[in-house]
C-alpha cells in the first residue's frame, strides 16, 4: 500500500501538459546557387605534408617512450634502509609505520 500512495504523488508531475502551440509547422528552405556562396568542397592536402606530419608524430612518440625508460631506470631503495627513509622522508614522518620506512 505504501507504494501505491507513493506513486500517486508523482501523477501530477507526469501528467501530459497541453502544448501552447497546437498546429504543425512546415519549413521550406530554398537552395541558393549564388557565386558568392563559399564552396563546401574538401581540399586535399599534399601527400608530402601528411607524411611529414606522420613522421613528426612517430618521432615525438619515440622520444616520449625513451624519456619514460630513462626515468624508470632509477632503482627503488630497499625498504627500511637509510636511503629509503631519506627518499620517502615525508611519508615516514606522517606515517611511521609505512612499509617503506621499516623492515
Curated annotation (Swiss-Prot):
Keyword Kinase on entry: no
Keywords: Chloroplast, Membrane, Photosynthesis, Photosystem II, Plastid, Thylakoid, Transit peptide
Transit peptide segment: 1-75
UniProt keyword Membrane present: yes
Biological process (GO), any one: photosynthesis
UniProt subcellular location: Plastid, Chloroplast thylakoid membrane
PTM description: The maturation of the PSII-T precursor to its final form occurs through a two step process. First, a stromal intermediate is formed, which, upon translocation into the thylakoid membrane, is processed to the mature protein.
A cellular component term, taken from the record's GO annotations: cytosol
InterPro entries, alphabetized: PSBT (IPR040296)
Disulfide bonds: none
PANTHER family: PHOTOSYSTEM II 5 KDA PROTEIN, CHLOROPLASTIC
Role summary: May be a component of the oxygen-evolving complex.
Protein name: Photosystem II 5 kDa protein, chloroplastic
Taxonomic classification: Eukaryota, Viridiplantae, Streptophyta, Embryophyta, Tracheophyta
Amino acid at each position: 500500500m505504501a507504494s501505491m500512495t507513493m506513486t500517486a504523488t508523482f501523477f501530477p508531475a507526469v501528467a501530459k501538459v497541453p502544448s501552447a502551440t497546437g498546429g504543425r509547422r512546415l519549413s521550406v528552405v530554398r537552395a541558393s546557387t549564388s557565386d558568392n556562396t563559399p564552396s563546401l568542397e574538401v581540399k586535399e592536402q599534399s601527400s608530402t605534408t601528411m607524411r611529414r606530419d606522420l613522421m613528426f608524430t612517430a618521432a615525438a612518440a619515440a622520444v616520449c617512450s625513451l624519456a619514460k625508460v630513462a626515468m624508470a631506470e632509477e632503482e627503488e631503495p630497499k625498504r627500511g634502509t637509510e636511503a629509503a627513509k631519506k627518499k620517502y622522508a615525508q611519508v615516514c614522518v606522517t606515517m611511521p609505520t609505512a612499509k617503506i620506512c621499516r623492515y
